[in-house]
Amino acid sequence: MIVAINEVSETEMRDDSVFDDGSIPTTWEVAGIEDVKGLKLFLKQAQQWVMSNNKEQLAAAVQYPINNIKNKEEMIAAYDQYFTKEVKLSFAMINFNQIFRTYKGVMLADGLVWIQPVGDTYKIFAINP
């Protein structure tokens, strides 16, 4: 059963202005992220969709076109091609206090997945399986 995610823990929201390795990440503002909690809620929800293979919800969370995929229906048909084991692990292993970000948006697992704000939500704009 899929449950709507509407909470982010205190630990997940702790200050991440310096990563554990001592590096200083780009600011959320540079990445275009005005609502860090909203982004983290999106990521938690996306984790759940990935782990339950909810193709419909994941396809709705993609900004099209992406790679050779023009729309939601094509993404659902090509789901296994893009949401590979490695891509799924990139969602499962998110460290909410170490989210890499640049002017392009936020990156998971060394660039396997990229996410950016679109209107009042967030969208996956690149998947590199």
Question: What are these model-derived regions, one by one?
Answer:
Residues 51-52:
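Charged, alpha-helical scaffolding/interaction elements associated with membrane systems
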